[in-house]
Structure formats: C-alpha cells, structure tokens
Amino acid sequence: TILDGELDNEQRGSEEYLINNPNYNRYDFISEGDSPSFFYLLDTGLRSMEDPTYGGWGGRFGVDTDGNYRNIVSDKFNGKDDTTYTLTRWFDDIQDDFAARADWCISSDYSKSNHRPTVKVREGIDLTAKPGERIKLHADATDPDGDRLDYNWWQYYEADTYSGSEDGEISMVGKESDTMSFVVPEDAQDGDTIHMVITVKDDGAHNMTHYQRVIVKVQGRQEINKLFLELPEEKDANAIETGSYSGWSNPYAFTITAK
C-alpha cells in the first residue's frame, strides 16, 4: 500500500521497504501512533473539539510563540507537572471504551455487550457567574443497558484561566452525586473561566464512561467594584445598608463599621 503525501521512508507498504525489512510478511501491517489525533473525533462530552486548550482524550495543548498549538502544557500527576499526563490520564477509560466496542463485533445481540451512558447538565454547559456566587449543577444521566452509574464531579483546573486554579481544586459539595455545588472564588476576575467536569461511569463489562464539561465564565467583578465606588462616603457607624443597585441584578447587603 502506497500512501499519497507520505515521505519515502514512511512508505512501509512499498515493495522496496518490504525487501529491506524481511521480518515483515507481505500482508503484515504496523499500527502508527496517531491515536490521539483520532480521539479528537470522538464526542466524549469533554468539548476538546471546541478548543485544543480544553484537553480531552487526545491530550491538551497550549499556544506556542509562533501561534501554533503544541503539547507544551502539563497536568498535575502525583503533585508534579507532567506533559504526558494530559493524555495518559484518560487511558483507562479509552481502553475500556474500545474493549466494549470490540464486543459489539462479536455478537449481533445488543444485550450481550456494554454501551456508553449519556449525561447532560441541566443548567447548560456555558454559564456566567459573579465572584462569591454559589453555583449548583445537576447531572441527568441514563444508561441504555440499565447499569448502575457512578458520578464524580471534578475541576479540570489546569484548563482554567482563573489564576487561583494553580493552587488546585475549588471546594465542592456533592462531588460523588448527581448534584454538585461550589462557590466562585471572591478573587476571580471578569473573563476568568472555571472548568467543571461530571464523569459518569457504568458498572457493565468494560466500564464505559461519558463526561460533560461545564465552563463557568466570571462576569460582574466590575459591577461589584462600581457598586462600592458609588456608595455615599459618609455613613453612620454600625449602620446596616441593604437594598438593590440599579447596575447590578443581585440584591446586596453589607455593614458599615467605624474606624
């Protein structure tokens, strides 16, 4: 087999290559190492097709100085930065997924093999929130085989643009349930993003997994700053001010204390 566009030394099915490499029989083949490129074509719910910096089964990439995307970023593995972990973190799920797919080839009986669950986040996958706001997310998942499902929420903090994510995950309530909540950090700035992922895994043969990534974009920091800048300068000590502000949709409450 001759592949158009490949270099001569990569034409491993050519007559010349087979003559110079007698250990290969005529119909043997070599599996090439471009699996990660193919994995980007699979809709896993991680949304890596939208942006290479998000990360997914095909790895996670950063923008290099020449503007091209390359594997120059790392994910944390055992507390250390590891550029390969952007890919290897998914290997168990990938292997189980393709093992289950191989079972589909053995029997035409649907019930004889495992199938991937589906999951959607009720609130949507692109949200906006203000610093200090509590976000609650509900995962609605089903399994075509009726398998039991395990839920795990986690923050893909290496993919965040919120600078505080360098310190690790934001605290979450309900990480191992279908409903999770967290508070947007007070120091988050307008435009910062926080990536939350729900992983749903079934208990069938070759456990199959599906994900849904929710990206929370921070908005409202400037509104909060404006609110405090426009408050009257003089207030009675220990007075409690409550009400609403025309430039901000949420009600506010704060205490003025004497200095």
Where are these regions (language model features)?
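N-terminal acidic, glycine/proline-rich low-complexity segments
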Residues: 1-138, 142-168, 191
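Short, solvent-exposed loop/linker segments at the N-terminal edge
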Residues: 127-133, 235-257
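Low-complexity "stalk/linker" and mucin-like segments enriched in Ser/Thr/Pro/Ala/Gly
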Residues: 120-122, 155-189, 228, 238-240
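C-terminal edge beta-strand
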Residues: 206-221
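Extracellular acidic, Ser/Thr/Pro-rich low-complexity tracts
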Residues: 127, 139-145, 157, 186, ...
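Proline-centered linker/hinge motifs at extracellular inter-domain junctions
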Residues: 112-125, 149, 214, 222-229, ...
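Extended non-globular C-terminal regions
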Residues: 178, 202, 211-213
